[in-house]
Amino acid sequence: MPLTGEYLGMRVHVDELDQENHAFFGWCGRHELRVQQCASCGLKRVPPTTACPFCAHEASTWVPVSGRGTVYSYGEVHHAIQPVFREFTPYQLLLVELDEQRNEPAEFDGLRLQANLATPDGELAPPELVRSVGIGTRVRVVFRDIGEGIAMPLWTVDEEAEQPESPWRYPIE
């Protein structure tokens, strides 16, 4: 059965034929962040794929991760293409390096997952929160239920983590 829902007025549909994403969003629907772990080399991977990008082995299992990490990079959207996002501009899309598997299998490798910046209750972040988050900010995952058995993973500032004094942000022109 496909996973269907609605996120900010947009229809979300993950068909069973897309086994990897169906499983990923199904775990998110249980409010668990899980990633694939290769049955051969043992390395974890995200986003979900049909084979390990490190050794090409196809078999994997889904393992839980902490859901905590550091902003590795970000994009700040000021002119939304999707009409539904216009009322939320500026908003951020964060690329977060998870705490697990840093610098593996080689230096500068890691588990990195993209998602929007949100408030702790799963709403898109207001402009004042967007302006405070930059590279180095510590975040944790939150889930926004969008349908039966499906949730959208989002990032929010981890209030329990030590934060950088001034996270790096792109210079304002």
Predicted regions and their residues:
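Short, cysteine/histidine-rich loop/knuckle motifs that typically chelate Zn2+
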Residues: 37-40, 54-57
